[in-house]
């Protein structure tokens, strides 16, 4: 990136002149957070430069400055106006990626021979990851499709390794992958199969880049058992808040629309509540039923209901809380319901809030101050077009669409803080209820009170790419200084990077200069413009004057992505139709597509990827911290995310935290509400005449008057009037009317209707599809836009599809298009509503809703449920289940079907419908999930801890896991055993480091003799070493490190003066050299060699002297020149065990210099080994804890602290935490520090925490008389501890699972990195197995078997008791004219809770051919003693569904309803009716019962053997007596595929039951043997439904020819039963004497021939 300049050559020449007399000022500007592996810009300037200046920029590691991480060069000269930039890129090394503390680098710019150096914070953020799932919600067993978009900081695609984890709602990872996007162009496409047995709730996909694991991006999806709704509901309050003084309450509009756009008719149940933090208070009295007509309804929360529902019932107690509203909308047909909720409607005293979040906190005296006032509604949304005014100055403005108003205030030439109060000025709001807010702005501090200022201002407009922004530079300086200012340098920061650098020149005398800035897509979503000028002020000081401004840009893509219609415009499309999509995108872009059913977003719209979400993530990563300006020039740079350093000492503060400083939060002021008198609710005045009239009305339940009066709520006067009239007036009979009914399908079907076989059912109903990535867009046009036309076939759903697109391009980055909607519908269709799952053998009702959207045409329709042997229903293999109905124009009819699922699994339910006299039809085939009976049980079989080191034998742990006890398992169901393995990550207990700030006293200037200099140098060396090791310079002061290193260099140089010719050291040159002091110099210099340049030759010569001059043959070191300053030698001062302690001390010093001197001193290794042998031999005799500790460290360095030496060392410790001598605090700190180093050398991390804790508790921070050794050793040991101790214990487990049903063992390796990952193996076999574990660390083995267990006892309904019966109506009942008969339906229900159930619903489906008596329903729902609140039937159509609303259901007595139902046409088989009761409050609390005139409980007939059932509703077999049957007929039929057996039998016994008949037969001849290994003369049981009794007419003692199919064999061998069904042949075989009769002769001959043929020849193949 090169800086831009003004066009004038003259200005350039002027700029190249020296700005003022004196030295030029060199400046370096970088972002104050540099990102690893990312290109960053460094701005370099020479103000007042001359000639050509060579500049190099080098980035070093911090603090050591040993590595060059990046190096770039440039020139500053008159051609570039002495302004240039370089681009640096810092590689991600292991040290920089460490998660211990914040990491920094040192950036050094060298201008000729002038160095400018700055320490800069680095960020490990590699870029962004955005995750898109194909849907927001999934069912168990389905597949999550997802894409991960890998982009850098500019949102451009990047190829990197990404780790992706899927986590359960409990945060347990179950899948972890690493994927590279290197050749994927930034788009990773992945999938995950959700198990059938899975935790419901919100799951997470988490992703991070390999080189920045601490920066995790995530997306959520929900797992739930659900069925997509057919419509959506929105709740829109008339205002986005509730104004506490509003007497009219809160109005909420309910909008309900089908997903294909048509309006919904139905009923909404609405309840309001108050949210107080996490607590919800439900306002039970607000529960109302709202009719939804043409898609709209309105619910009102009355003010009094709101006040009465909370404690205390005062308006001021509600302020600050919010209102929520829940609505459940039920379709008129009762076939579908949708719940919706709106939360966070704030209760407020003022409808608006004022914020100053977009206003700078600093102003320039006597210059305009731009106040950006942000006004919001109480829900946080922008408040548009609200007038605002400042108090005092009375400046007015109006908020724009984004809620922001700009108010420019002229400030006075004072340096006092500026207090500004802003208030709204909205009409119709009392003065006391207007919003007000006060802020204080502080004056910008100029250097040395020079009063030189710069003010940047921008107009308040919504900026879009392509527009030009005029930035005004306002200058205010002393007129004499103005001529010195020739230019402003400006920088633009965007997305944490320097986007643009340039100069804006000014002519003399110009107070205002305008920079026209062209906005490009790179400026999205916002940017900061920082500008400054520099001059030498009147006092001769170099000064920098700066300002900044934050500018918002309209959030949109940086590029282009549009999905639209590429074919002819159509309002609606038909299912399965081909449509053309046109995709417009940037050149070279790759576009990821998905089409999602809008019903998915009705259930969950939280987790969609949008462009807004992308910008939110990017804005959060902004390194700037304020809306602009700053406390002074340095504050302007820092707050904008920049760091500045100049050669003349002007610089910004050090940034040490990636997060912006958070302002302290203020507590809300208590709001005093004006006391107001509350409106009282009006009293209900009873109408006594109405009470009397109602008493005279007919009551279908025939209750006595006293019982009826109990339902009256209107008071005693009304009860008296009601009873008086009820008891003396005869009942009025009212005529029944009929508006239409189901008609029976005629057998002589008309020709003008499409046959069922020709109707192709719709069967493709995916919730999402079109999951594809497009790469082959056409060549770009002149605007750089590429297009693609895609032809796709729509799926079969009647809905609206949202087509979502996300693109990624190399130049324009990531872009999320606005969703493109495709609506699919037809004017006649079936909506088949199936539950998520049904239970095998349990009768259920499903509904097919037939819609007619024709404008003015009623449709006569034949509808049919197709036969499927997996279900028992009125559709059988022999008889179709057809009905004819009429659907009025723009209406719908619900057709209920009762079915019994017979088999577990996924089975198809298919309904077809055709319209008479039109070529219009529709069919729907959907899959229904049938689950086993009983309850799903998760049985924990075993939970074992895996810890082979402690629980195993020889390092191997074996666990035998038994099979689960499944004695209560439902027959014919599977079990699944899950074997779960998880590592147990055990954290290593670590102690905190000593706070670096406490070490400031240790940084000191060394001086004095050879001993005093070391006493002065020691604390600084060890303090710098400790702060380096614990990453604490940011606390201590990053700039102090350089100063400390200078002091170490000084001490080093001074110490060399005391080096004798022999290379040994003493206090003075003339004194004999000291062994201890020389060894100590080696120790300190060896450590300092990591910090400053130390001459290794000098150091190693000193080492040689120690070995050659002072070590005896037995390894001991001797002292011949004791030190003068005995206080510096610490515990060595004690004369006991001196040989051992000196030898250990020197050995340690030599070992610490080993890395530097090993190559130069050949004898170093031997010398250390000899000294070690000496210590080893004398260790057992030691008595002093000090000597035990120092010698232990020396031995541990050589790996010799083992066995009894280790035992002695550990036993010497007091309380296992210190090596202590009486009354010797400093010696004890020193000795315990040596002991800690010994433990660390042995990697014994479990023993170290108490030792470190003891050292920390001494609160010893070094310094003071006699502290040299204690200071050095305590900080050396604690630094080593922080460096060495791992943050966790080792975990490396190998686990193998040996399942008998598998050939080989399943193996898993558990490492620390993946410890929390839940590994699982599944098996369908319930068997005993073995688990074997080896290795280090801990894990957990859990074994869970999931199966369906039988329910104990009959399951009652949830929370409701329900009885339903139907009986013939008395002869006296008056029938409607065209009714064939009448019956009375009795429904009794009782709530099983602790109190009455409010707002309950009876959903009743009628038996085929029946309709309810409308007058009865009117009577029940009107009058003061009404039993039902309201009833609803399908408008203008067949009354085959009825919904009754009850205000309450008693929990003490049964509430009963009775009403007549009339039969309008006869049908061969009457399908049972169903009654369901449920409470609005809890839709799961349901109870369902069936009814039928002939079947008790209204249940379809099933044949059951043990726990397995089959349908018996099919027609009986054809009894072969009617027509003559030939020999050929018998042979053909008996040899049909599927026929299993052919027997001659004799009936010996009949058992006639209520439902089924059993016939015991003896097998007399096996004509064709089948699956049953039956022998002649054995008995077998034949079973038939009672409906077939008359058709069969079997006689005891008679013989029969019987054959049947294998599917009619029942039970297990040897006790097999035979079902007599539609495929069974039963033919009377005449007795021998009957064969003599002429009429039987032919049959007897044929039967004999048939038997012979079958036995001799069998069936032809």
From Swiss-Prot:
Keywords: Cleavage on pair of basic residues, Complement alternate pathway, Complement pathway, Disulfide bond, Fatty acid metabolism, Glycoprotein, Immunity, Inflammatory response, Innate immunity, Lipid metabolism, Phosphoprotein, Secreted, Signal, Thioester bond. Disulfide bonds join 557-815, 625-660, 691-718, 692-725, 705-726, 872-1511, 1100-1157, 1357-1487, 1388-1456, 1504-1509, 1516-1588, 1535-1659, 1635-1644. Its main location: secreted. The record marks 1661 as: Coordinates Mg(2+) for interaction with Complement factor B Bb fragment (CFB). C3 precursor is first processed by the removal of 4 Arg residues, forming two chains, beta and alpha, linked by a disulfide bond. During activation of the complement systems, the alpha chain is cleaved into C3a and C3b by the C3 convertase: C3b stays linked to the beta chain, while C3a is released in the plasma. The alpha chain is cleaved by the serine protease complement C2b component of the C3 convertase to generate C3a and C3b following activation by the classical, lectin and GZMK complement systems. SMART domains: A2M (SM01360), A2M_N_2 (SM01359), A2M_recep (SM01361), ANATO (SM00104), C345C (SM00643), Thiol-ester_cl (SM01419). One of its GO terms (biological process) is positive regulation of protein phosphorylation. Residues 1-22 form the signal peptide. Complement activation is inhibited by VSIG4. Residues 1516-1659 form the NTR domain. The record marks 745-747, 953-954, 1302-1303, 1319-1320 as: Cleavage. PROSITE patterns: ALPHA_2_MACROGLOBULIN, ANAPHYLATOXIN_2, NTR. Glycans are attached at residues 938, 1649. InterPro entries: A-macroglobulin_rcpt-bd, A-macroglobulin_rcpt-bd_sf, A2M/Complement_sys, A2M_N_BRD, Alpha-macroglob_thiol-ester_cl, Alpha-macroglobulin_TED, Anaphylatoxin/fibulin, Anaphylatoxin_comp_syst. The modification Phosphoserine is found at residues 38, 70, 670, 967, 1320, 1571. One of its GO terms (cellular component) is cell surface. Residues 691-726 form the Anaphylatoxin-like domain. It is found in: Secreted. Residues 1632-1657 are annotated as: Interaction with CFP/properdin. This is Complement C3. It comes from Bos taurus.
């Amino acid at each position: 990136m090169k800086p831009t300049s003004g066009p004038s050559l003259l200005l350039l020449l002027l700029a190249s002149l020296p700005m003022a007399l004196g030295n030029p000022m060199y400046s370096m500007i970088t972002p104050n957070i540099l990102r690893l592996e990312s290109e960053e810009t460094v701005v370099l300037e020479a103000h007042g430069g001359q000639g050509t200046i060579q500049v190099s920029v080098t980035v070093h590691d911090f603090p050591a400055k040993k590595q060059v991480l990046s190096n770039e060069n440039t020139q500053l000269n008159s051609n570039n106006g002495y302004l240039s930039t370089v681009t640096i890129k810092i590689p991600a090394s292991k040290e920089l990626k460490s998660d211990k503390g914040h990491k920094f680098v040192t950036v050094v710019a060298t201008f000729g021979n002038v160095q400018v150096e700055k320490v800069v914070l680095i960020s490990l953020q590699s870029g962004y990851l955005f995750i898109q799932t194909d849907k927001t919600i999934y069912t168990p067993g389905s597949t999550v499709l997802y894409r991960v978009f890998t982009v850098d900081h500019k949102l451009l695609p990047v190829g990197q390794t990404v780790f992706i984890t899927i986590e359960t709602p409990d945060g347990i990872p179950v899948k972890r992958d690493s994927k590279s996007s290197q050749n994927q162009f930034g788009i990773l496409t992945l999938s995950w199969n959700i198990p059938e047995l899975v935790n419901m709730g919100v799951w997470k996909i988490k992703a991070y880049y390999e080189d920045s694991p601490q920066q995790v991006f995530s997306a959520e999806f929900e797992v739930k058992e659900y069925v997509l709704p057919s419509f959506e509901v929105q709740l829109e309050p008339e205002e986005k808040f509730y104004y506490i003084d509003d007497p009219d309450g809160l109005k909420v509009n309910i909008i309900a629309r089908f997903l294909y756009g048509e309006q919904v008719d139905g009923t909404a149940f609405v309840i309001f509540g108050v949210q107080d933090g996490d607590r919800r208070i439900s306002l039970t009295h607000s529960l109302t039923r709202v009719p939804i007509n043409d898609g709209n309804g309105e619910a009102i929360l009355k003010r009094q209901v709101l006040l009465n529902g909370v404690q205390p019932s005062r308006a001021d107690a509600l302020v600050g809380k919010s209102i929520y509203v829940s609505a459940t909308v039920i379709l008129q047909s009762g076939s579908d319901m949708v719940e919706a909720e709106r939360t966070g409607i704030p209760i407020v005293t003022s409808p608006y809030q004022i914020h100053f979040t977009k206003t700078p906190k600093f102003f320039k005296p006597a210059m305009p101050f731009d106040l950006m006032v942000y006004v919001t509604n109480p829900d946080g949304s922008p408040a548009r077009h609200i007038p605002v005014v400042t108090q005092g100055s009375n400046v007015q403005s109006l908020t724009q669409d984004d809620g922001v108003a700009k108010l420019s205030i002229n400030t006075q030439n004072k340096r006092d803080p500026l207090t500004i109060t802003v208030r709204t000025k909205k009409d119709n709001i009392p003065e006391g209820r207007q919003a007000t807010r006060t802020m204080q702005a502080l004056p910008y501090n100029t250097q040395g009170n020079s009063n030189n200022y710069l003010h940047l201002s921008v107009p308040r407009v919504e900026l879009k790419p392509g527009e030009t922004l005029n930035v005004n530079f306002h200058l205010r300086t002393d007129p004499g200084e103005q001529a010195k200012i020739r230019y402003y340098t400006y920088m633009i920061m965007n997305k944490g990077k320097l986007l643009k650098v340039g100069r804006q020149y000014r002519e003399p005398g110009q107070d205002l200069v305008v920079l026209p800035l062209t906005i490009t897509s790179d400026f999205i979503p916002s940017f900061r413009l920082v500008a400054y000028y520099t001059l030498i002020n009147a006092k001769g000081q170099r000064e920098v004057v700066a300002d900044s401004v934050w500018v918002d840009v309209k959030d949109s893509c940086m590029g282009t992505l549009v999905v639209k219609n590429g074919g002819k415009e159509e309002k609606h499309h038909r299912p399965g139709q081909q449509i053309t999509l046109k995709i417009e995108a940037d050149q070279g872009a790759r576009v990821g597509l998905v089409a999602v059913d809008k019903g998915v977003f009705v259930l969950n719209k939280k987790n969609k990827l949008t462009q807004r979400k992308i910008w939110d993530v990017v804005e959060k990563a902004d390194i700037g911290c304020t809306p602009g300006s700053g406390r002074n020039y340095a504050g302007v740079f820092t707050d904008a995310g920049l760091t500045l350093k100049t050669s003349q000492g002007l610089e910004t503060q050090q940034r040490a935290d990636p997060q912006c400083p958070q302002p302290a939060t203020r507590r809300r002021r208590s709001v005093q509400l004006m006391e107001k008198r509350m409106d009282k609710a009006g009293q209900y005045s009873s109408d006594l005449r109405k009470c009397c009239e109602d008493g005279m009305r007919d009551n279908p339940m025939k209750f006595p008057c006293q019982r009826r009066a109990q339902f009256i709520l209107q008071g005693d006067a009304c009860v008296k009037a009601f009873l008086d009239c009820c008891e003396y007036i005869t009942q009025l009979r009212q005529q029944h009317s009929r508006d239409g009914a189901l008609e029976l399908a005629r057998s002589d079907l008309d020709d003008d209707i499409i046959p069922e076989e020709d109707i192709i059912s719709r069967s493709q109903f995916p919730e999402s599809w079109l999951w594809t990535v497009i790469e082959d867009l056409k060549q770009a046009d002149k605007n750089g836009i590429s297009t693609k036309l895609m032809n796709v076939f729509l799926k079969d759903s009647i809905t609206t599809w949202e087509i979502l697109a996300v693109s990624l391009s190399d130049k324009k980055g990531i872009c999320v298009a606005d969703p493109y909607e495709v609506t699919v519908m037809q004017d006649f269709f079936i909506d088949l509503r199936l539950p998520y799952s049904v239970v095998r053998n349990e009768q259920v009702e499903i509904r097919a809703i037939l819609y007619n959207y024709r404008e003015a045409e009623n449709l006569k329709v034949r509808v049919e449920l197709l036969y499927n042997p997996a279900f028992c229903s009125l559709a059988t293999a022999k008889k179709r289940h057809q009905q004819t109905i009429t659907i009025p124009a723009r209406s719908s009819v619900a057709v209920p079907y009762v079915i019994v699922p017979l088999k577990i699994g996924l089975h198809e339910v298919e309904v077809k419908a055709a319209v008479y006299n039109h070529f219009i039809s529709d069919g729907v085939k959907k899959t229904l999930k049938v689950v086993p009976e009983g309850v799903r049980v998760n049985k924990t079989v075993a939970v074992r801890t895996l810890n082979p080191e402690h629980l195993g034998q020889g390092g191997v742990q074996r666990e035998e896991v038994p099979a689960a006890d499944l004695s209560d398992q439902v027959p014919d169901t599977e079990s699944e055993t899950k074997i779960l393995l998880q590592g147990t990550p055990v954290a290593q207990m670590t102690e905190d480091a000593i706070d670096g700030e406490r070490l400031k006293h240790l940084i000191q200037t060394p001086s004095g003799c050879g001993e005093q200099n070391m006493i002065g140098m020691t604390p600084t060396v060890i303090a710098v070493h400790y702060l380096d090791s614990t990453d604490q310079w940011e606390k201590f002061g990053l700039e102090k490190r350089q100063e400390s290193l200078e002091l170490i260099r000084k001490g080093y140089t001074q110490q060399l003066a005391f080096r004798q010719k022999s290379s040994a050291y003493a206090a003075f040159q003339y004194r004999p050299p000291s062994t201890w002091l020389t060894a100590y110099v080696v120790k300190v210099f060896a450590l300092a060699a990591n910090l400053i340049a130390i001459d290794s030759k000098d150091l190693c010569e000193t080492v040689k002297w120690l070995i050659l001059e002072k070590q005896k043959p037995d390894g001991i070191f001797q002292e011949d020149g004791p030190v003068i300053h005995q206080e510096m030698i610490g515990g060595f001062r004690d004369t006991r065990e001196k040989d051992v302690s000196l030898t250990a001390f020197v050995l340690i010093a030599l070992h610490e210099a080993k890395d530097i001197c090993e190559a130069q001193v050949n004898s170093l290794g031997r010398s250390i080994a000899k000294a070690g042998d000496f210590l080893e031999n004398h260790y057992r005799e030691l008595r002093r804890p000090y000597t035990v500790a120092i010698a232990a460290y020396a031995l541990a360095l050589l790996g010799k602290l083992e066995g009894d030496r280790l035992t002695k060392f550990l036993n010497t410790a007091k309380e296992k935490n210190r090596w202590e001598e009486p009354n010797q605090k400093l010696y004890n700190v020193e000795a315990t520090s040596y002991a800690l180093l010994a433990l660390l050398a042995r990697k014994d991390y479990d023993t170290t925490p108490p030792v470190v804790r003891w050292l920390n508790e001494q609160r010893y921070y070094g310094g003071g008389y006699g502290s040299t050794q204690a200071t050095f050793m305590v900080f050396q040991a604690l630094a080593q501890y922080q460096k060495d101790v791992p943050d966790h214990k080792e975990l490396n487990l190998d686990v193998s699972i040996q399942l008998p049903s598998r050939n080989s063992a399943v193996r898993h390796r558990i490492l620390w990195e993946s410890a929390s990952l839940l590994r699982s193996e599944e098996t369908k076999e319930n068997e005993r197995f073995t688990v074997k574990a080896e290795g280090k660390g801990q894990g957990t083995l859990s074994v869970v078997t999931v199966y369906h267990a039988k329910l104990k006892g009959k399951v009652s309904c949830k929370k409701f008791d329900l009885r339903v019966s139907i009986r013939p109506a008395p002869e006296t009942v008056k029938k409607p004219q065209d009714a064939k008969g009448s019956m009375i339906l009795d429904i009794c229900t009782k709530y099983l809770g602790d109190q009455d159930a409010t707002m309950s619903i009876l959903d009743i489906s009628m038996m085929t051919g029946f309709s309810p008596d409308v007058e009865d329903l009117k009577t029940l729902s009107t009058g003061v003693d009404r039993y039902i609140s309201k009833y609803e039937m399908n408008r203008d159509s067949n009354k085959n569904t009825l919904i009754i609303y009850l205000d309450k259901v008693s929990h003490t007595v049964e509430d009963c309803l009775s009403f007549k139902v009339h039969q309008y046409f006869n049908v061969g088989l009457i399908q049972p009716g169903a009654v369901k009761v449920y409470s609005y409050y809890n839709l799961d609390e349901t109870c369902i019962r069936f009814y039928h005139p002939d079947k008790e409980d209204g249940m379809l007939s099933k044949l059951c053997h043990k726990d397995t059932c089959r349908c018996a509703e099919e027609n009986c077999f054809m009894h072969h007596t009617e027509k003559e049957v030939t020999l050929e007929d018998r042979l053909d039929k008996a040899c049909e595929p599927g026929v299993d057996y052919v027997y001659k039998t004799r009936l010996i016994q009949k058992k006639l039951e209520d439902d089924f008949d059993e016939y015991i037969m003896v097998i007399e001849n096996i004509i064709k043997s089948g699956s049953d290994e039956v022998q002649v003369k054995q008995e077998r049981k034949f079973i038939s439904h009672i409906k077939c009794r008359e058709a069969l007419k079997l006689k005891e003692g008679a013989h029969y020819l019987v054959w049947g199919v294998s599917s009619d064999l029942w039970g297990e061998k040897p006790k097999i039963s035979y079902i007599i069904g539609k495929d069974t042949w039963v033919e009377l075989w005449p007795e021998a004497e009957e064969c003599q009769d002429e009429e039987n002769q032919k049959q007897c001959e044929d039967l004999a021939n048939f038997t012979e043929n079958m036995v001799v020849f069998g069936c032809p193949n």
